[in-house]
Amino acid sequence: NELIAEVYLQTEGFTQARGLSKKIVSLFMLSKQLLSRQRHYDWGLRALKAVLNTGGKLLVQARGEAQVSVGMEAELLIKAVRINTLSKLTFSDTSCFLALIGDIFPGAESSDVAGGELEVAIRKVMQSKPFSLTLDETQICKMLQLKEALDQRMGCVVVGPSGCGKSTVWRVLKAALIEGGQAVQVHVMNPKSMPRQQLLGEMDMDTREWTDGVLTDAARNVVKAPAEVRSWIVCDGDVDPEWIESLNSVLDDNHLLTLPSGERISFGGNVNFLFETHDLRFASPATISRMGMIFLADEDTNKKRLVSKWLLSQDNANRSHLAGWLEDIFYKALDYLVRMRSFVVETTLVGTILNGLSSISGVSTKLSFVVGLIRGLGGNLSASDRSCFAKEVFAWAR
């Protein structure tokens, strides 16, 4: 891998290709050994190639603006690593990975991907209708990372627990691109809601007549679109080997979809496949290595922003009382549940928060707030745990 990386860096124009190739390969090897084992992690040659390709683009861009020094080459390569890798790391692995970068590239500094005009458009779209969202720097960073991943790869996966904002990330990015003058068309489908033949199409063995499926029909539509129009085929649902393996040739450098009828559909650089799912346990390593990853963790969720947004929907007369009770009781109760982790039915942090808030909507007295909170947050606990939880909540409410 060192030799491959060295040759690739030389072709991209790096003068210190040998030294940088050793460092970047060491970083990938140590990351594979030291970071947690996650299904969506890929430390192979495809991921390395994506980093080197981004580094080459950044180098060309930097040389167009000023003279590039030896130290600046390392900084550009670190920036390429951050752009391609930080988006897929879990909350706990991120700090470990950044420490590895600091050890392998001592003294070199770098920053995340710069948003520029796109970031300005994202902020404007988030605050305007129909989104009306509270600005969240982590979420904005994920949107910029998704844009970079879509530019790098044909296929991208937005993976994370239910309610973490996966749909919001790509929908806001789409609106921001349109705001910036880029035409974007989207085809959304749930592959798990239909049989394979209805998704990918089938051939009648008697008449030899081909019938398009939902995905193949969308594929025909996007290849007809003008080159200046960005087209996204969004698959919202579980990534299943039954149909995803058929797209492997699309997701690699060939960009070809071969139908069972023998017909081939070739996609241009303006087409992307975007997969939105809660996990990748059924996807093969071959599929994962072909796609860019945007991982949204429960820890990235800002619970106070979520609660503040809900509070704005309440009556003005109750809002000040609710704000005080939320601060004094709700957050303590939520932290207590997170520490317990004894839910009867597995749920996410966002799901737990929304359950609790739904039960205290419209309350006007402290007693009704406490009773509603116990009902909402404690409804997913066993009888004994619910009793202990209720005692704690009543103690905080005194």
Please state what every model-predicted region is.
Residues N1-C156, G292, L306-R398:
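Alpha-helical lid/collar subdomain of P-loop NTPases
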Residues N1-E2, V184, D252-D253, A283-L312:
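A short helix-turn-beta junction within AAA+ P-loop NTPase domains corresponding to the substrate/partner-engaging
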Residues E2, R153-M154, Q182-Q185, V229-R230, ...:
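Short glycine-/polar-rich loops that comprise or flank the Walker A/P-loop
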Residues G44, L146, L199, L247, ...:
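Conserved RecA-like P-loop NTPase ATPase core
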Residues C156-M189:
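Walker A/P-loop
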Residues G160, G201, G237:
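The Walker A (P-loop) glycine that initiates the GxxxxGKT/S ATP-binding motif of P-loop NTPases
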Residues A176-R208:
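AAA+/P-loop NTPase substrate/partner-engagement loops
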Residues D204-T207, T216-F275, D298:
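Conserved catalytic/switch belt of AAA+ P-loop NTPases
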